[in-house]
A protein has these predicted regions:
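Transmembrane alpha-helical segments and their short flanking loops
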Residues: 72-78, 123-126, 137-229
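Hydrophobic faces of alpha-helical transmembrane segments in multi-pass integral membrane proteins
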Residues: 1-2, 29, 33, 37, ...
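Short, amphipathic, aromatic/basic-enriched membrane-interface segments that mark the entry/exit
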Residues: 24-29, 117-125, 174-175
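Transmembrane alpha-helix interface/packing and boundary motifs in multi-pass membrane proteins
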Residues: 40-53, 65-66, 130, 135
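Membrane-helix interface motif
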Residues: 5-14, 64-71, 168-176
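Helix-loop-helix junctions within the multi-pass membrane cores of secondary transporters/permeases
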Residues: 65-148, 152, 156
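Transmembrane helix-loop junctions in multi-pass membrane proteins
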Residues: 5-14, 51, 110-113, 133-138, ...
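Signature of multi-pass transmembrane helix bundles
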Residues: 1-51, 180-229
Length: 229
């Protein structure tokens, strides 16, 4: 088989697979709308109690890591902000930090009237600062809770669109594509990507998502407060 591929323009089987499979998939997974589709699919699975990230990640991770590697190579040669791709795994992990529920947790911890949501917010705050959101997802619960369906399923997409626009407009440099470990607190993912603007954008996105969550949180909190009286 190796001899047959050596006689083709691909040169080897690995290059053939890369050209025929990886490049078309990269075209799908390396654009804004594909990322939005992947994200909504993952959040829908989360809504039904399935770990959506683990289910969807094997599809997009190889594609997005390829884009990150291209950014790393470009930054190594030309400096911060020289990345050629806006989209990548680093972009996704930085700007959809913790499933974008940190703002919701802060609302519960500091603005809830009901003891139910206030207690849950305070218990979940520290984990959420480190991107750990299972206490919120299963404690609220957000699973099968149609009160929070819109912000829970579509919040990450809003974060992606805002962040993409900020980078595409030049307000924030493209990320350097650095891989990070899970469990870093908010701000660290962005700082590792090489610019203070990315840190500011991550915080701005969190605030905006908190505003998106607010009307849904207020309704649920008022209902819970009435039941407690």
């Amino acid at each position: 088989i190796s001899g047959l591929f050596a006689k083709t323009s691909y040169g080897c089987m690995h290059q053939f697979v890369y050209s025929i499979i990886q490049i078309p998939l990269q075209g799908l997974g390396g654009n804004l709308w594909a990322m939005c589709i992947f994200t909504i699919a993952a959040q829908l699975l989360w809504f039904f109690g399935i770990h959506g990230t683990n289910v969807i990640a094997p599809i997009y991770t190889p594609i997005w890591l390829t884009l990150d590697l291209a950014n790393q190579a470009s930054v190594a040669q030309n400096g911060i902000g020289a990345g050629t791709n806006i989209i990548g795994k680093a972009f996704f992990e930085t700007f959809t930090f913790g499933g974008c529920v940190l703002g919701f947790v802060i609302l519960m911890a500091f603005f809830a009237k009901s003891s139910q949501y206030k207690s849950l917010g305070r218990l979940s705050l520290v984990p959420a600062l480190f991107g750990i959101t299972e206490p919120v997802i299963f404690g609220t619960p957000l699973v099968l809770n149609f009160t929070f369906f819109i912000p829970f399923v579509f919040g990450n997409v809003i974060a992606i669109l805002i962040s993409y626009a900020a980078i595409a407009s030049g307000l924030v440099p493209t990320l350097m594509g650095a891989s990070t470990i899970f469990g870093l607190p908010i701000g660290f993912h962005a700082a590792i990507q090489g610019s203070w603007q990315a840190v500011v954008l991550q915080i701005v996105v969190m605030v905006i998502l908190g505003l998106v969550w607010y009307p849904f949180f207020r309704k649920a909190d008022n209902d819970a407060y009435k039941l407690e009286q």
